[in-house]
Design a protein with these regions (language model features):
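Short acidic/polar alpha-helix capping motifs at helix-coil junctions
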Residues: 1, 27-29, 57-60
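Short, positively charged
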Residues: 4
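12-transmembrane solute porter fold
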Residues: 8, 33-41, 58-262
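Short, highly charged, low-complexity non-transmembrane loops/tails of multi-pass membrane proteins
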Residues: 265-269
Length: 269
C-alpha cells in the first residue's frame, strides 16, 4: 500500500491554516497577522499540494480527473452540500435558544428534521436514478435546497420554531434527491478500479466543506448575543449558503439547457 504522506501533510496544513484564518477573522481585523498570515500559508501550502499531487506516482487523487467537467462540478457540489448541511445544525440552536428560549431536547427535535427529510427521499431518489438522469435529480435537489435556505434567510426575523423545522425538512428532502444522484454521477466518471478512491475523496471533500462552512458561519454569528444582531447574522449565513448552492447548480443547469437545445435542433431536422 502506497501512502501519500507528503500530500496528506500538505493538504492538512493548508486546510488547517485556512480554517484558523477564517476563525481569527471573526475576532480580529483582516489586517491582523493571524488572519492574513495563515491565509498566505494556506495559499502557499495548497499550491505545493497541487504541484506534488501532479508529480507523484501515488497521489491522494489524480487531479487530472478535474479536467472532466462532470466530475469537477459534482465534487464542488458535494463540497457545498456538506457545508450548507452543517448550517442546519449550527444556526438553529443559537436562534432557538436565544430568541425562542427552547430547551435542549426541543432544539434537538428541530435539528432532526433535516436528516429526516434526507432519509425519506434518498431511497426514492436511488430508485429514480435508473430512469431519470443524475443531472436532473441533482438539479431538483439543489433547487429545493435553495428554496428552503432562501426562505430561512429572508424570513428569519418572523419565523417560529415550527416553520424553521418545516423549512429544514424541505432542505433535507432536497438533500435526499441530491446525495444519491451526486454519488452516482461521481462514480460514473471514473473506472471501476478507481471508485473506492473516488468514494473516499467525495467524503473527504464533504468533510472539508463542513469545516469550511462552520468557520465561515462563525464570521456571521460570532459576538451576536444581542437578539437583533443574532437574527441578522443568521439571515446572512442562510443567504450565503443559498448563494453557494446556486453556484453549485449553475453547471448542471447549463448542461441541461445545452442538452435540450441540441435535442430541439436535432428534432427540427
Amino acid at each position: 500500500i502506497h501512502l501519500d504522506i507528503r500530500g496528506n501533510l500538505l493538504l492538512f496544513l493548508s486546510i488547517f491554516c485556512l480554517l484558523i484564518s477564517l476563525t481569527s477573522w471573526s475576532y480580529h481585523s483582516m489586517l491582523d497577522i493571524s488572519v492574513y498570515g495563515n491565509f498566505l500559508i494556506f495559499i502557499v501550502t495548497f499550491g505545493l499540494f497541487i504541484v506534488w499531487e501532479l508529480k507523484t506516482h501515488h497521489p491522494i487523487i489524480d487531479l487530472r480527473l478535474f479536467k472532466n467537467i462532470s466530475f469537477s462540478s459534482s465534487i464542488f457540489a458535494i463540497f457545498v452540500f456538506g457545508g450548507t448541511t452543517s448550517l442546519g445544525f449550527i444556526i438553529p440552536p443559537y436562534v432557538l435558544e436565544t430568541i425562542n428560549h427552547l430547551s435542549s431536547w426541543q432544539i434537538g427535535l428541530v435539528n432532526l428534521t433535516s436528516p429526516l427529510g434526507l432519509v425519506l427521499t434518498s431511497k426514492i431518489a436511488g430508485k429514480l436514478i435508473s430512469c431519470i438522469s443524475n443531472i436532473i435529480l441533482m438539479t431538483i435537489g439543489l433547487v429545493i435546497m435553495i428554496a428552503a435556505y432562501t426562505n430561512l434567510g429572508l424570513l428569519q426575523y418572523i419565523l417560529n420554531p415550527i416553520t424553521i423545522s418545516l423549512l429544514l425538512l424541505l432542505y433535507g428532502i432536497g438533500g435526499g434527491f441530491f446525495l444519491p444522484s451526486n454519488t452516482s454521477a461521481i462514480m460514473g466518471t471514473v473506472s471501476q478500479d478507481m471508485q473506492g478512491t473516488v468514494g473516499a475523496t467525495q467524503r473527504m471533500v464533504q468533510n472539508i466543506g463542513i469545516a469550511f462552512y462552520t468557520a465561515v458561519t462563525s464570521l456571521f454569528i460570532n459576538h451576536s448575543s444581542n437578539s437583533d444582531k443574532l437574527l441578522e447574522g443568521s439571515s446572512h449565513a442562510w443567504l450565503f449558503a443559498s448563494l453557494t448552492l446556486f453556484l453549485a447548480l449553475l453547471p448542471f443547469s447549463v448542461k441541461l439547457l445545452k442538452h435540450k437545445f441540441f435535442e430541439e435542433k436535432y428534432d427540427s431536422k
